[in-house]
Amino acid sequence: MRAIGYNSYGGIDKLQILEVESPKPKRHEVAVKVSAISINPVDLKKMRGGFKPITSIKKFPIIIACDFSGEIVEIGNDVGAFKVGDKVFGMQDILFNGSAAEKITISQKYISLAPNNF
């Protein structure tokens, strides 16, 4: 699966297209086929190593971008508020990998249903 990320801390010149494993949702997670992302100042700070002391990511590569929208393609066993096919948007926790990938997994508590005209 393709993603956009980096293999060392630095500026935007470190970004590259990565080949990463396609994630599977855990019990309280959904898998989302990502259709859009945004890059904001927090992402750039993370890229420069600004959250290194507190992040849960211990190895490279790191996928960029917190904000996303897309469609649920798989759900974990304990997900009740969403179903496959739902259009959603959300924000990945800054301490974990981001959303600049073809598919991501995320806890159901970090997403919302997208408006009908979305």
What feature does the model see in each segment?
Residues 42-48:
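Cytochrome P450 core scaffold surrounding the K-helix E-X-X-R motif
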Residues 81, 91-118:
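NAD(P)H dinucleotide-binding glycine-rich loop of Rossmann-like/cofactor-binding domains
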Residues 1-2:
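Extreme N-terminal starter segment of soluble prokaryotic enzymes
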Residues 21-38, 51-95:
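Glycine-rich beta-strand-centered segment in the early N-terminal region that forms part
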Residues 10-15, 41-42:
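Short N-terminal binding/cap micro-motifs at the start of the first secondary-structure element
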Residues 17-22, 69-71, 103-105, 111:
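Conserved hydrophobic/aromatic beta-strand scaffold that supports enzyme active sites
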Residues 14-19, 98:
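Residues that act as N-cap/strand-start positions at coil-to-secondary-structure junctions
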Residues 6, 47, 73-74, 105-106:
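Short beta-strand-to-turn element immediately C-terminal to the catalytic PLP-Schiff-base lysine
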